Structure formats: C-alpha cells, structure tokens
C-alpha cells in the first residue's frame, strides 16, 4: 500500500512538468493517478473520501452539466464534452488523499519540482528572448 501511495504522491508532484510537456502527458497522469487512487481507496476501505464536502459539491455541479447536456439539441456532442470532467473531481480527491497521507513530504517534493519547473521555463523564456529560439520547445 505504501508504494501505491508513493506512486500517487510522485505523479501528483510531477504534474507541473507534465503540464508543460503537453495535454497528453498531463491527462495520462490524471488517469493513472485516478486508477491508483481508486485502488488505494478500495483496498483500504476508506470510503469517507467520497463523502467529502468538496466531492459532493463537485457531483452536484457535474450533474448540472449532464442535465444541461441532455437538454441541448445535439445530445451526443454535448455529452462528449461534459462526461470526461468527472476525472478532475476524482483527481481532486486523490490530491486530498495524498495530502492526508503525508503532508510534509508532499509539500516538500511538490514545491521543489514547482521551483525547478518555473526556473527552467524562466531560463528558457529569457534564452528565447535574447537568442531568438527556445530550448524546451
């Protein structure tokens, strides 16, 4: 169980560079984190995370999206764009779960990776401004 929690922790902490890398990498991280989170929750039987007030508020908001999609002219097109939002609510629960499990380690790793990501992007932006081409892409 500890390795699953560590995997969730490191994947969440690697989200800033994943967002820089592109939407495919970031969305893949979110999906993997969600699967690991569901596995950890069902293995430890900690279902109270699904009763969290944030998640209930998200579910209400999500069902408003679904009902609004069902009232549109093109139901399939509307549902296609609103159904995948569920993964973001579960991702938020995974972040809450990770912070509850090991807050100090999470904050330490996350802010170091965030600092490195911002430093690389700042250096790349300055390099691109003065040299005319960028390094990162």
Describe the predicted segments one by one.
Residues 27, 86-87:
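Extracytoplasmic catalytic/substrate-binding loops of multi-pass membrane glycan-assembly enzymes
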Residues 1-80, 97-115:
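Transmembrane signal-anchor hairpin modules in multi-pass inner-membrane enzymes, especially those
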Residues 90:
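Phosphate-binding glycine-rich loops of NTP-binding sites
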Residues 120-137:
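Membrane-interfacial helix-loop-helix modules of multi-pass inner-membrane proteins that assemble, modify
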Residues 87, 111-124:
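Transmembrane alpha-helices of multi-pass, membrane-embedded glycan-processing enzymes
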């Amino acid at each position: 169980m500890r390795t699953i929690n560590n995997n969730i922790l490191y994947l969440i902490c690697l989200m800033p560079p994943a967002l820089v890398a592109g939407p495919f990498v970031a969305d893949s991280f979110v999906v993997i984190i969600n699967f690991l989170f569901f596995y950890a929750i069902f293995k430890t039987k900690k279902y109270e995370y699904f009763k969290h007030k944030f998640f209930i508020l998200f579910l209400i908001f999500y069902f408003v999206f679904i009902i609004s999609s069902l009232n549109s002219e093109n139901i399939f097109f509307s549902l296609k764009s609103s159904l995948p939002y569920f993964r973001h609510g579960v991702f938020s629960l995974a972040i809450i779960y990770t912070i509850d499990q090991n807050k100090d380690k999470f904050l330490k790793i996350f802010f170091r990776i965030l600092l490195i990501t911002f430093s690389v992007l700042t250096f790349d932006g300055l390099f691109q401004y003065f040299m005319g081409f960028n390094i990162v892409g």
